[in-house]
From Swiss-Prot:
It comes from Homo sapiens. The gene is COL9A1. Residues 787-901 are annotated as: Triple-helical region (COL1). Heterotrimer of an alpha 1(IX), an alpha 2(IX) and an alpha 3(IX) chain. Belongs to the fibril-associated collagens with interrupted helices (FACIT) family. Covalently linked to the telopeptides of type II collagen by lysine-derived cross-links. Prolines at the third position of the tripeptide repeating unit (G-X-Y) are hydroxylated in some or all of the chains. This is Collagen alpha-1(IX) chain. Keywords: Collagen, Deafness, Disease variant, Disulfide bond, Extracellular matrix, Glycoprotein, Hydroxylation, Metal-binding, Repeat, Secreted, Signal, Stickler syndrome, Zinc.
Amino acid sequence: MKTCWKIPVFFFVCSFLEPWASAAVKRRPRFPVNSNSNGGNELCPKIRIGQDDLPGFDLISQFQVDKAASRRAIQRVVGSATLQVAYKLGNNVDFRIPTRNLYPSGLPEEYSFLTTFRMTGSTLKKNWNIWQIQDSSGKEQVGIKINGQTQSVVFSYKGLDGSLQTAAFSNLSSLFDSQWHKIMIGVERSSATLFVDCNRIESLPIKPRGPIDIDGFAVLGKLADNPQVSVPFELQWMLIHCDPLRPRRETCHELPARITPSQTTDERGPPGEQGPPGPPGPPGVPGIDGIDGDRGPKGPPGPPGPAGEPGKPGAPGKPGTPGADGLTGPDGSPGSIGSKGQKGEPGVPGSRGFPGRGIPGPPGPPGTAGLPGELGRVGPVGDPGRRGPPGPPGPPGPRGTIGFHDGDPLCPNACPPGRSGYPGLPGMRGHKGAKGEIGEPGRQGHKGEEGDQGELGEVGAQGPPGAQGLRGITGIVGDKGEKGARGLDGEPGPQGLPGAPGDQGQRGPPGEAGPKGDRGAEGARGIPGLPGPKGDTGLPGVDGRDGIPGMPGTKGEPGKPGPPGDAGLQGLPGVPGIPGAKGVAGEKGSTGAPGKPGQMGNSGKPGQQGPPGEVGPRGPQGLPGSRGELGPVGSPGLPGKLGSLGSPGLPGLPGPPGLPGMKGDRGVVGEPGPKGEQGASGEEGEAGERGELGDIGLPGPKGSAGNPGEPGLRGPEGSRGLPGVEGPRGPPGPRGVQGEQGATGLPGVQGPPGRAPTDQHIKQVCMRVIQEHFAEMAASLKRPDSGATGLPGRPGPPGPPGPPGENGFPGQMGIRGLPGIKGPPGALGLRGPKGDLGEKGERGPPGRGPNGLPGAIGLPGDPGPASYGRNGRDGERGPPGVAGIPGVPGPPGPPGLPGFCEPASCTMQAGQRAFNKGPDP
């Protein structure tokens, strides 16, 4: 009992030390494959300043075991401690790396091999290599062999004569017990020393070693008799260190403590009384990783990953489609006419050669449309083209409205031209004109830069975007992955230099029509073609997009306030529009009431296209005017005086994009305008862009309880739990009724001799006997009076029972008695501690029964990192949308600049589409 207090203290201290010791061991060193400490390309440096400065090489990283675990090729398990990570290598994986990638200059003369691993199942009885280096023909050169048949560890190496030498360490039964073990072998110049669990086992002499063949492979976990077969085991740590004495300084804190059994075993005592509650225990160590959860929903597309390393040259691709015409090369010298040869087999269509100086041939049949080329760089501004001939007379325009002149009614003959009006609103998009004739060839653009030569290969599987790391070693050959998603379009490469003129190839057969290509980039604006013939009146087009804002107009005179209209219904709040261009600085307004400081709002989304405006009244039909001939352009006249505000002019053509004006001062809030009439239903607008991810919504109300599901199948039987903690001692039970006297038991078998009493014990017993019977002994020593010898008396009655004597010497142990009757079950013990998480079981059989109801929709994930992707291709036009609710009429816009009118369009009906961008009603 004196040592019982040491046990909880021992575990209390260990619970604090274990995380620190485990954490120190868990961080495996990751060193480069080659050390360049001495300027050479050797594995270990020749100059050894200090043993602790020598490098080590983590074989788990070199064999990419951890990466294979992330790809689920192998299983990641708990190691020798709760904080350790290990890898369960099965017999279906092959860890094999070219030796040249790991040890380009071979192994050093002195080094040490260290590993922490565990064998389970049938591996305990197998003869296998935990690490081995093979030559180019597959023969062993260096290796560490674990032989479960002879319970030994064998270090094999290649001698100077090329023969395989071995150093066998035997009698290692403690290594084959399904527990975690740590073996280390220090290879010195003339000896090899084995350490098992940081205990030195033996040092064996070894012969000088020859160089290894680096054209072979380094492997992990292979059978000794068949190196192609893998052996299942669990690997936590494997290291090659340049210090051969490293095993002497290594510790084994990561290994679990092994409790040795006691020499004697007593019978189990009765349960003790319940003690007082103990002090609160220390914080528990972090738990191990939980089991993998269900597959989550597909996340949003991630940002484009960094450019991967160039792949290996792919297999030759299929013949590509004919490329675009190349640049015109210099004229070659005419060759001599050769003799006519025999007709050969049709050859493979050659690449398009440069035009020669042959006689023009007859026009060929129209060819198939080529693939659209990549958008070239914008060339320099060309010289102005020559003035084109006047176009044919246009069709008669619609009848104009009755004009006014200085307030007079209709002019008797013809009204003089009025002042130039303000530019009208942009007109609706016109119908597509007929294809114009080919214009004059433009000037040759500048020579483009040379493009990179692309490699033709099959489409490879797109890997997950990883961090840009150092170039790793060649990994194991994996299975061919699924076809990845289409990558982003690359930047167009620069124009390549013209190649040498090719030989004139034979005319190949016309090729089959290729598939429809993707929509090409918008080309440069061509030279305007000649006016085409008048086309039939087309259907009304869809609403055109808003035009580019015009130049800021001059400040107009304030209009007269209109009569107040009836109070309209409260309109729906409009979508925040796109910020307008910067206006010109307005006049300083009156100081308004100071508003409350508002918070900075988020950027608004692009507004949707509003409904068309109200249809204005149709004017009276005017008389058709006679069309005059187009006169020459007159010289610009002198600037006239500023006239009075004229009547609105004819709709002007869209002006060039204006420069953004200065930001104007905050204007005074105007009075609400009169209620407008109900506008016509507009056509459905184009689908807007996808909005940003909204904030997480509030949790919804609790749903009603679902129907109880069908009972599931009975699960597999769980593993037996750990024995519970010994329960408290129960209260003494009532005294039982005296039982009947049992039958005399059989004599026991002669037991083993008891323990011999010590000399000290004998002295104590003798002293106690002498003290108790000293008076009787002294009386017996007196000389008695001499007398006649009397007759022996009758035996007296039995005296009273004497006092209980002292404990005698321990007797010899008797034979073991017959087993007693099974006693009643004991009291229920306290709940035992939670056991360690067991290994992940095999996948069970598929369940039966109908599928369950789908789970609740999870909350949206956190927004991904901000990135700026490239603009995607224009999408197809969507179906017409539902007409939106008419918006609140906006405030009147500022007056525009004075408009202008081309003579060819002066006869258009004034105001026909001045304020209506939609079709006629």
